[in-house]
From Swiss-Prot:
Location in the cell: Plastid, Chloroplast
Entry-linked CDD domains: Ribosomal_L20
Gene Ontology CC terms: chloroplast; ribonucleoprotein complex; ribosome
PANTHER family: 39S RIBOSOMAL PROTEIN L20 (PTHR10986)
Name of the gene: rpl20
Role: Binds directly to 23S ribosomal RNA and is necessary for the in vitro assembly process of the 50S ribosomal subunit. It is not involved in the protein synthesizing functions of that subunit.
SUPFAM superfamilies: Ribosomal protein L20
Similarity comment: Belongs to the bacterial ribosomal protein bL20 family.
Identification of the protein by name: Large ribosomal subunit protein bL20c
GO biological process, one term: translation
GO molecular function terms attached to this record: rRNA binding; structural constituent of ribosome
A Pfam family annotated for this UniProt entry: Ribosomal_L20
């Protein structure tokens, strides 16, 4: 049987892993084994945090809408209920932007 050297394939695989972790500190960017572990950890963290970012922004928008609604003596819950009854279908991001940038428009949405 002929001898098969894995030099090129292994080098290419290691090079890709080290390229992924090039900005990391210390051994996490230079040593293959620790770089591989750190690269896997970073990918799982980024996947998890993409979902977390969506939740965090939704919480922020709801907080802003609630704060703006309470200036007019209404709670967030009653505001959303009234908007659905009147068939005003604005998402929370748009409502939060309107509450911050155009208070007059937001007060007309409240029905004041």
């Amino acid at each position: 049987m002929t001898r098969v050297k894995r030099g090129y394939v292994a080098r290419r695989r290691r090079k890709n892993i080290l390229k992924l972790t090039s900005g990391f500190q210390g051994a996490h960017s230079t040593l293959f084994r620790t770089a591989n572990q750190q690269g896997m950890k970073s990918l799982t963290s980024s996947h998890r945090d993409r979902g977390k970012r969506k939740r965090d922004f939704r919480r922020l928008w709801i907080t802003r809408i609630n704060a703006a609604a309470r200036r007019s003596k209404k709670s967030y819950h009653t505001l959303i209920q009234e908007l659905y009854k009147r068939k005003i279908l604005l998402n929370r991001k748009m409502l939060a932007q309107i509450a911050i940038l155009d208070t007059y428009c937001f007060s007309t949405l409240l029905g004041d």
